[in-house]
Amino acid sequence: KKKEVQVKIVYYGPGRGGKTTNLEYINQKFKKRIQNEMVTVKTYGDRTLFFDFLPFDIGEIKGHSIKVQLYTVPGQVKYNATRRLVLRGVDGLVFVADSMDLRREMNIRSLQNLKENLETFNKNIFNIPLVMQYNKRDLEEEGIPILSTDTLQKDLNSRLKAPYFEASAVKG
């Protein structure tokens, strides 16, 4: 029997921060390697209601078939029970922070919510693989006020010290 390793990675962050756009970009970029369709359950106004799900096969490493399952959670606070459900069995996290200046407080609240939801599964945010994505960095070119990387680091990552990167989910 073939040995298989499944890895569940959850994209977490405030509503309209770019979680779904990340998965759509990955789906488009790696279409040839992804045999399955991306599953999205949307609500009014094209917002994620339940979750997005993108399964794909990375290939083989040391005789093990590696399967990755990417999920997003709904960003809106009213769907917190769904967020907890999606976090069950998580192996790693990408926290997608919205770089827009006016989203500063939402980022902080969303990260706090992630910590609390992980605790319901007796998981500690300090003991789980986590990467910070500072999204929408491209908006500065359009004259939209964005937070500096230093501010995002201070607000979200001063204690966690997780790896971080700047990004634009629409551009990759």
Would you name each region that the model predicts?
Residues 16, 76-77, 100-102, 136-140, ...:
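Conserved nucleotide-binding/hydrolysis micro-motifs of P-loop NTPases
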Residues 2, 46-49, 59-64, 84-89, ...:
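Conserved catalytic network of the ASCE P-loop NTPase/AAA+ motor domain
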Residues 38-78:
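Switch I (G2) and immediately adjacent beta-strands of P-loop GTPase domains
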Residues 102-124:
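Amphipathic helical hotspot of TIR/SEFIR-family domains
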Residues 92-95, 119-138, 157-166:
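Conserved beta-strand/loop subsegment of P-loop NTPase cores
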Residues 1-43:
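Conserved G1/Walker A P-loop phosphate-binding module
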Residues 79-102:
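Inter-motif core of Ras-like GTPase G domains
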Residues 138-172:
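Canonical P-loop GTPase G-domain recognition
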